[in-house]
Amino acid sequence: MTFLQLLIIAVVQGITEFLPISSSGHLILIPNFTEFPDQGPLIDVAVHVGSLLAIIVYFFKDVLTLARGGFASIGIGTDRPDAPSERRLFWWIVLGTIPAVAFGLAIKLGAFNSIAETWFNITVIDDDLMSSIRFTDLIAFNLIVYGIALGLADWLGKEVKKFEDMSWRDGLIVGIAQALAIIPGTSRSGVTMTAARALGYSRYESARFSFLLSIPAVAGAGVLIVPEIFEAGATLAMDALIAGVLTFIAAFLTMAFLMNFLKRASMLVFVFYRVAMGCALLAFF
């Protein structure tokens, strides 16, 4: 892959991963607007890992709190005054991660292949459902539907909760929403922010909740792809490394912008963008 292609993929991923407009949808569409070949799942995961590192650095204090909660769960640091609340937040994040892990494993094992072929008339190629549903109409549909859902949740949702107020119920509901983001065009950040806003979290706290919840899921995806990285050869592995580093830079800058933007503005601009892009895809592709 050329450096230009890696740069475009990284910038698109770094921006769209954190804005609620679907990173996977934009990455899949790159070959339609350029002469570049599809970058494939390896580069997709590499840029997601770059995004993950950006989250860890930006929310380092929150990540440290969750880490202390994990240690407190195994009896380390339980004498700290904040240990009970840190432990609680840690376990609610774990609970919220389970739906995405279960859904992802089910897809990987082919549990939904027959449903996709029978109910939705989708031809599953080589038992790979995710590669088989990377098509424009599905992306457009999800951009519009989940964009409208985001707008309604942002309009009707109260702003009374912070991340520290998370209950097991909130963690599970937002976690189930996160599982839906496996489908291209949905937007992991968009669907989790939608769920959090519907539960009464402020815009800023919805984004904070969304990004912290993404850490285990994205890390897990990175771990699963490690064997493929070693099998891919040095050249492709270097491409993945470059893409990951470039994505980290773009993602960190985008996240800083978004968190400040949400302190003073609504999500309406993202709703309009999603609906407009979805309609354009249906009209021209």
Swiss-Prot record:
Domain of life, per lineage: Bacteria
Membrane-spanning ranges: 40-60, 89-109, 137-157, 171-191, 209-229, 241-261, 265-285
An example molecular function term from Gene Ontology annotations: undecaprenyl-diphosphatase activity
GO terms (BP aspect): cell wall organization; peptidoglycan biosynthetic process; regulation of cell shape; response to antibiotic
EC number: 3.6.1.27
Topology class, membrane: Multi-pass membrane protein
Keywords annotated in UniProt: Antibiotic resistance, Cell inner membrane, Cell membrane, Cell shape, Cell wall biogenesis/degradation, Hydrolase, Membrane, Peptidoglycan synthesis, Transmembrane, Transmembrane helix
Subcellular location: Cell inner membrane
Catalysed conversion reaction: di-trans,octa-cis-undecaprenyl diphosphate + H2O = di-trans,octa-cis-undecaprenyl phosphate + phosphate + H(+)
HAMAP family listed in its UniProt record: Undec_diphosphatase
Entries under PANTHER family matching the protein: UNDECAPRENYL-DIPHOSPHATASE
Stated name of the protein: Undecaprenyl-diphosphatase
Organism of provenance: Erythrobacter litoralis (strain HTCC2594)
